[in-house]
Amino acid sequence: MFNFFKKDSNSLLYDTYKPFLFDEKHVWLNSEGWYKLIHYLFDDKIKDEFNLIPIKNGCWADTYNDGRRRVISLFHINTSFATFKWGWNFEYIPHYTSKITWCRTDKSIYTHTFELSPKFINRKGDNYTVFGKFESKYKNNSEGFQKFVSDHLKVWDTLHEAIVEYYNATSTYEKMLNRLEENQKDGYYSFILPTNSIIYAFIKKYVHSIEAEDDFQKILFVDEKVKDAYYKAFSKIKWYSNFNKS
């Protein structure tokens, strides 16, 4: 537990991050300092709670287990503010930009499907679901920086319950498919994650569902080139034999 509220530790923390503060009046970190603070505050929390480790700026993951791994990362609202998102990366599902690419390494990791806190999606005013590089209401001094840090920690406390619920609800492939079905019916997620239908079909193929082919063919791709590229990867999936095991 970080004890930011002792005078000496507050002063030390402020002194550590002072070189990254570039506004004379208010707390405003540059990008390097902000990521440094985020990892200082959250690396241990995420490791202790979910056994995920930092793999790059603003991203934590575990190792592959049954073709997938958990990923918690920053969901950037803009260049200055973010919240957390949490989801899964799949070893056997590619990502398409201008061509099919695989996302199997820490460097290339991609969160295929994820969720955000309902408190963030439906937020009204400041409900501690977002943190940022700067806060104009706090002065650039030890006390102001303490409050800035405290706000970051409150965001984690606000989001924590939803993260736990999500990973419990997607702990098996069967549960994962059920969750994806729910999200495909949700207006918000169908808008920000239209690729959930692709993830759904790929998982069905991986667990050897006889419906996988039909599910894939129902997907509305932007063009045939994209569909063909995905289908090539889809056809090569080796099925998983432990679908019904917890």
Summary of predicted features, one role per range:
Residues 57-59:
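Beta-strand-connecting loop/turn residues
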